Structures are given as C-alpha cells and as structure tokens.
Amino acid sequence: MAKKRGKRTWMTRHVNDPWVQRSQQEGYRSRASYKLLEIDERHGLLRPGRVVVDLGAAPGGWSQVAASRVASGGRVIALDLLTMEPLEGVRVIQADFEEEAGLDALLAALPDGRADLVLSDMAPNISGVKVADQARAMALAELALELAISVLRPGGALVVKLFHGAGFESWMATARSLFESVRVRKPEASRAESREVYAVAERFRGSTAD
C-alpha cells in the first residue's frame, strides 16, 4: 500500500510540475532539457560543428537540445542501455559503453574517435538506501569521467550529474586535475529538495595518450 501511495504522489507531482508542462508545450522530450539549456546559456558549450556524446541519453531530452544547437555541421551520439526513439540529427546507439562492443560502437561513430563535449545525466535506480544510492550515483559519475578522458579532444568539456555526499569532493578533485575549470551548477529545473547538481568541466588538458 505504501508503494502505491508513493507512486501516486510521484505521478501527481510529475503531472503538475511546471517544467514537465512546459516541456510538453514546447516539444521537448523531458523536463531535463531545460537543465542543459540553462547550463549552455551560461557556458556556451553547444556550438555549431561540435561533436557531442550523450551518455544515458534516453528518453532524449539532452540529445534533442544538443542536436538543435550543434546544427548540421555537428554530430550527436546518444548512448543508452534503454531503447530511445530516433531523433533528427542524433545517432542513437543502444549499448553499454562499459563493454567492449559498446565502446567500439561509440568510437566508430566519432570522427577520429574524438569528441568536443561529453554529457552525462545518468542517475541510478533509487533504492531508498541513501548510502547505496550515493555510491551508485558516484560510480556512474566516475564512468562518465573515465569515458571523457578516453574520447575528449584537448580543450573539450564534460557536463555530469552529481549528488552531494560521499565521493563528491574526491570526484571534483580528480576533475580539477584534468580540466582547467570545474564549476558546480544547479539549474532552475532541478527540484529544490534534490541533492542533484551538475559539474561543468571545461578546457580538458588532454590525456597522457595525446
């Protein structure tokens, strides 16, 4: 019974959410689109001609924004384990980038195996156990950072969802050693009660392999 009540509460909040309503009116696939739009307005990451990788992309809200801003000269590659409906200007790869086949598919889709920007709005399925949920969230952020190190051109950027808690400061310290600038943003479309923030890491210094 408690689970049903919780689901009804979530559904009511979702339906009445002004960002959800706005996304439906303006044709975006999710309320998350507005988070990336705000971040891009502040940092100017999505420029025409850029190559963008979107991790955990389904249902496609971030890929949709990215494709509209990098224009026809750019490229957006969306990866997710889940099925994602096609989007104009987006190459969708249903795969796990932790596995060799998924990583190979991504690299094959990238010009010269390199990207200008890596996006990650990935979040774990919430169990309700805060310690476990935080550990899973930070593990996803670590994976996004590792992937970014592998594919970003020198000077590239990374935007990744983080949650304040265990592992946050360690992740930030690592990112600051790899990028010239790392800032934390909480877009207006993020729920006020959520610990969710986004790290915006710019001007990648380059991996040792470069």
Give the ranges of each region predicted by the language model:
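Class I SAM-dependent methyltransferase Rossmann-like catalytic core
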Residues: 1-48
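Conserved class I S-adenosyl-L-methionine
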Residues: 48-58
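A short glycine-rich, Lys/Arg-flanked "PGG" loop and its adjoining helix->strand segment in the class I
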Residues: 67, 138-154
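Short glycine-dipeptide loop
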Residues: 72-74, 152-157
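S-adenosyl-L-methionine
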Residues: 79-127
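Class I S-adenosyl-L-methionine
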Residues: 165-210
